[in-house]
From Swiss-Prot:
It comes from Xanthomonas oryzae pv. oryzae (strain KACC10331 / KXO85). Coiled coil: none annotated. Part of the Tol-Pal system, which plays a role in outer membrane invagination during cell division and is important for maintaining outer membrane integrity. This is Tol-Pal system protein TolB. Belongs to the TolB family. The keyword Metal-binding does not apply.
Length: 439
């Protein structure tokens, strides 16, 4: 389990531009659990209606899997799809009412020329027999999964009123091999684990990846200089910048919401404290000054304050301090161990690794109604490193199963968990990236 201090041996790092890399071994993905109260929706297969080569991506399968793993929806199994309309005029609503479906998605894929495809799809309210959404998107073959995720986002938002977060990316660290032959990699993949690509390879562990708010860079910890150092790396080009290599600990980087500052934990004065660095001038502002260990900073959504882990009260708990410094206030009071906070986009929810004895689970404190209420999101015994999706509908975290590291993405109501497992080795240190924008 990750404790407030977790600094490892020196690194030898190979830096790799994203565009120049072959994809590494991917993650095996499966969905665990479900909920009878999830909204029923039929996502009908979308056939290819063209004369050329059909795309390899099964658009409807990707859309359905996205909706399933959100915990908000339950898609109709393929064996129960008794009719296969491809457009609204072909939908027999009584059929889907009989099958007790609230919504139905239909569509088709067509040849758009020059190696591109056009996807047209529609969303209907089954009870009312009314169309809620009708859109068309065009993309090349290698972007069809992106299109599918964007379709799922639009459907999710139209029904729930909440922006979808399927077309996003996650970062994580993999570890494979044994003993002196261990190898590590900082990876970026789609939010469902597909399309993994390597950002950094290393002969020693890598730590604490953190996304810039525009999704273009990652901050992370490296030991290649003989001491922990913090780097910023451009995901597309592989270009990187050393931003912190003070004597002692340089750890736990966290981008501010405007991307102009970096919160970090430094022990340059002897004890680990929370600092903020202006990334333009590289000027440091020390926020905490306490004999306890202060680490794992993460920003409040408005950029006005920073949450962090501290054992100043005797055991690790979450505290909050103004981004300009000052006195810190304790935030968590339930349990003897709360660490590695992740804060939702609206600041109302905080996910933490919560410990009791030798058991560590992911818990969430919800302040939406004023007084904080707690819920447990994970069932494991060694769960850590929670990271909210940008819409706070899911939480990504690391777990130990059978002596190896895996990732889970759990819906924020704990209805559904998606497991992401490396076929040969461990996966750890997850970080959910920001919303993406189409160019």
């Amino acid at each position: 389990m990750k404790k407030p201090l977790r600094w490892l041996a020196a690194l030898t790092v190979l830096l790799l531009p994203l565009s120049a890399l072959a994809q590494q071994q991917g993650l095996t993905i499966d969905i665990v659990g479900g909920s009878a109260s999830a909204t029923p929706i039929a996502v009908i297969p979308m056939p290819y209606q063209g004369s050329g080569t059909a795309p390899q991506t099964d658009v409807s399968a990707v859309v359905g899997a996205d909706l399933d793993r959100s915990g908000q929806f339950r898609t109709l199994p393929a064996a129960q799809i008794v009719e296969k309309p491809t457009r609204g005029t072909e939908v027999q609503f009584q059929t889907w009412r009989t099958l007790k479906q609230n919504y139905i998605v239909v569509g088709r894929v067509m040849d758009a020329g020059e190696g591109a495809y056009r996807v047209e799809y529609e969303l209907f309210d089954v009870a009312k027999g009314e169309r809620m959404l009708g859109l068309a998107m065009t993309a090349r073959a290698n972007a069809m999964r992106d299109v599918s995720h964007q379709m799922a986002d639009a459907i999710y938002e139209k029904i729930t009123g909440v922006r979808g977060a399927f077309w996003t990316r996650i970062a994580y660290v993999t570890a494979s091999g044994k003993g002196g032959a261990m190898r590590y990699a900082l990876m970026v993949a789609d939010s469902d684990g597909y399309n993994p690509q390597t950002i950094v390879r290393s002969a020693e562990p890598l730590l604490s990846p953190n996304w810039s708010p525009d999704g273009k860079k990652l901050a992370y910890v490296s030991f290649e200089r003989g001491n922990s150092s913090i780097y910023l790396q451009d995901i597309a080009t592989g270009a990187r910048e050393l931003v912190s290599s003070f004597r002692g600990i340089n750890g736990a980087p966290s981008f501010s919401p405007d991307g102009r500052r970096l919160a970090l934990a430094l022990s340059r004065s002897g004890n680990p404290e929370i600092y903020v660095m202006d990334l333009g001038s590289k000027q440091l502002t020390q926020l905490t000054n306490h004999f306890g260990i202060d680490t794992e900073p993460t920003w409040a959504p408005d950029g006005g304050s920073i949450y962090f882990t501290s054992d100043r009260g005797g055991r690790p708990q979450i505290y909050q301090v103004a981004a300009s410094g000052g006195s810190a206030n304790r935030v968590t009071f339930q349990g003897n161990y709360n660490a590695t906070a992740s804060v939702s986009f609206d600041g109302k929810k905080i996910a933490v690794a919560q410990g009791s004895g030798n058991t560590y689970r992911i818990a969430m404190m919800d302040r939406s109604l004023g007084s904080p209420s707690w819920s447990t999101l994970s069932p494991g015994s060694l769960d850590e490193s929670p990271s909210f999706a940008p819409n706070a509908s899911m939480v990504l975290y690391a777990a130990r199963e059978g002596g190896r590291g895996v990732l889970y993405a759990v819906s924020s109501d704990a209805r559904v968990r998606q497991r992401l497992v490396l076929a040969d080795g461990d996966v750890r240190e997850p970080a959910w990236g920001p919303y993406r924008t189409a160019h």
